[in-house]
């Protein structure tokens, strides 16, 4: 298939047909509070059930501007020392929540057989740049210290998140590279990340209308987040990546952000970082949240976690 007639999976095509014909306002046409409600409602109709898990509990993490809520997922009620995944949700720094990412985090906890801690960082526009990044760094450092309130003996970290959360994954990993936490980051796992404010990419032109993440949606997020150009937290692609942890980076072939994700993979390679790239061919941005509406996504998620397990075993055999 050419870029003008890209390959689209049949179940992705059906979902897009439904989404693009759906009545009512789009999230970028309403205030942030209403946009967040739309996101929560989408989980209820498009994502898989949370399913059974031994542990789903809420904790409070001290942050730079007050308490940061978080949620712990674990398939085991009793967990010995080991790594944990710290997860930063997507949503353009404006939408998304613990609730909207609960099915995905629970599934990862089951597949990975490690605790997953989802961070409910402050959202823009109420808390613009760099508040989300500040919260994520603070929360990750706190988790790394194995505080009694966490109830886990943390030996290493996996930083992960999707879209805006992919950005937060990378910039948190950069911050901990430059000023290490109590335990190391074993692997960073950004999922279709945003790594630059530069909109001039072929995939941005090809897929910015009709493929879930739209030009209007990206403008809405950009205005709300008010990121400062030239800061490593807004444009990590433009900053050195030497010394970063082993990295698993995923992109989607129908994603406006695809090409900047690929550029980040190349940046890591040039910096001598161990990196693996997985492309979800025929799939769209945001797919980890729509496993029920797009059944083929389950295989994508399982493939990501299998690759992550292999990478973890290589960098930390005791993990």
Predicted ranges, named:
Residues 1-72, 312-319:
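A glycine/proline-hinged amphipathic helix-loop "lid/cap" segment
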Residues 81-91:
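Short beta-strand element of the alpha/beta-hydrolase
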Residues 127-147, 304:
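Alpha/beta-hydrolase active-site loop
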Residues 144-159, 179:
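Gly/Ser-rich "nucleophile elbow"/oxyanion-hole loop immediately N-terminal to the catalytic nucleophile
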Residues 174, 178-229, 243:
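Hydrolase active-site cap/lid region
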Residues 249-251:
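Short beta-strand/loop motif that positions the catalytic acidic residue
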Residues 294-319:
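Catalytic active-site module of serine/aspartate enzymes centered on a nucleophile-bearing elbow/loop
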